[in-house]
C-alpha cells in the first residue's frame, strides 16, 4: 500500500513526512526542497500485535506497514507543466491514496506561496490542477470509446458514463464525487483518474490551536466543509509537534500528548485513518518463530488471505483454524482457548475478520 503526501510548498508536508518515517527529508523554508519523492515505510500501530508478542516472546516481530511517498510541491499551472508539475502528476499517479497536507497555522516566519493562509484556496488550487490533468486523460478514453462505438453499440453506456464524469470534472468536482453503480465503479477505476483516489486532508495546525480546541479554528472549519463536499476524510494534526516527539521514548511521548489533551499521536491517528480509508484490515499469525500482522481488504475470504503468506497456502487450502483476539486474551493461552472450544475450523467461504488469529492448514 502506497500513500502520497501532497500539498503546496511550505505547508508542513516534509515536516510531517520526516516525523512519520525519520527519513530525514530535507525540510527547508523555500519551495521545492523535496525535488525527488522520498519514500518511507512505517508500521501500522496495532496494540493486539504487542499483546501477542508479550504472550509468545517470538524471535521475530513483524507489523503491517504502509509506504509513504513525499511528493514534490506543486503550484498553479502544474497540469500544464509549471513548477514541478509534470513530475508531481507522474508521481501521484503511482499511489493508492492521497494525504493532502493543508496549512491551517499562522506563522509570519514561514512564507506562503500565495502570501496568506487560506486553506480553502489552497485545496482548490491543487484540486484544479488534478481535475485539469484528469480531463486530459479522460478525453483520450472518450475518443477511444467513440471509435469503438462505431463498430459496436454496446459501448454507448460506457460513453454516456464517461461524458457524465467529464461534466463533473468541468464543473470542478472530483471523479470521486460521481454517483456510480458497481459496473461504473470498475469503468472509472480502469481510467486511473487522480481525483478518484481516496483522500485525507491533514489539517496542519499549531499547538495553540489544539490547546484552544481545533474545532474552534475557522481554518479547520473551512477544511471540514470542503472535505464533506469532496467525499474526503479530514484529520487535524500538528506536524511540528509530531516531528518534535518522534524521537522521544514512549513514556515521554505519552506525557507530552497528555499535556495537549491527546491519547495518541497524530501520526498514529493518520496511519490508522489511511488504513481504514483504503478498506484494509489485519489478520494475525502467532507463534514462537514470529508474530505478524498481514494486510488484506475487508471481505477477503480465507484462501485468498492465506495466499498473502504464500501462494501454496491458497492453492492447497484445507481449512483455517481461527480464534478471535479478545477470546485468546481472555483465555491466556491458545491451549486454553482450544479447551473452551473458542478455536474454530473455517472453510473456503469464511470471510476474514479484523484481528483474527489464524493457523492455515494446506496440502500441495
Region locations from a protein language model:
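Conserved G1/Walker A P-loop phosphate-binding module
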Residues: 1-111, 139-140, 144
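C-terminal-of-GTPase-core extension/linker across diverse P-loop GTPases
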Residues: 2-6, 11, 17, 144-351, ...
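Generic signal for short, ordered secondary-structure residues
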Residues: 14, 31, 67, 105, ...
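Short, intrinsically disordered, mixed-charge
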Residues: 22, 54, 90, 94, ...
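Glycine-rich, flexible loop/turn motifs
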Residues: 23-31, 38-40, 48-51, 80, ...
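Amphipathic alpha-helical transducer elements in NTP-driven molecular machines
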Residues: 32, 46-49, 62-68, 82-96, ...
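Conserved Switch II/interswitch segment of TRAFAC-class P-loop GTPases
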Residues: 40-45, 72-82, 93-155, 168-181, ...
